[in-house]
Amino acid sequence: FEGDRIKAVREMIVSKTAAQRRVALEKILPMQRSDFEGIYEAMEGLPVTIRYLDPPLHEFLPTNSYDITQLAKDMHIGLDELKSVISSLHEFNPMMGHRGCRLAISYPEIAEMQTTAVIQAALAVNERHPDWKIEPEIMIPLVGDVAELRYVKKVVCEVADKLIQESEFDMKYHVGTMIEIP
């Protein structure tokens, strides 16, 4: 991520409330939608699997003093408060940590935004290229229990079904998982 992208992702990560997170996600949505449209266009109708946000959140946060100070200013929060957030997000064992499907369980608005981007991108490309008949394939990462998958799949399907119903197109999509048990 560069420039405005990393700034919006960092804003999403350090948000304290769902409302703050949704503001950041609204900035990320058009970026992801555009990226997914580009992928669908490049693949010219071939299957595409989109893996949802997976890395531990601390990997997106700044590590040097200048960037930490700048993020605190951009977010209008105290430097010590931001350092505390960064410290709290660092994970000793990231495979067992707060990432992948567990992130979508804690913050379903992230999965909602990613689903919106995936489905809107596929609908837009299908409109331009109806012969491609794109069927998005969504991968929920780092699933270790069926209950995790059920929860996140419900979030994904509710958003996808609503967007498809509101469109002029009948489009299929698939939701799968990467099962990872350390």
Predicted regions and their residues:
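Conserved alpha/beta-domain cores
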Residues: 1-182
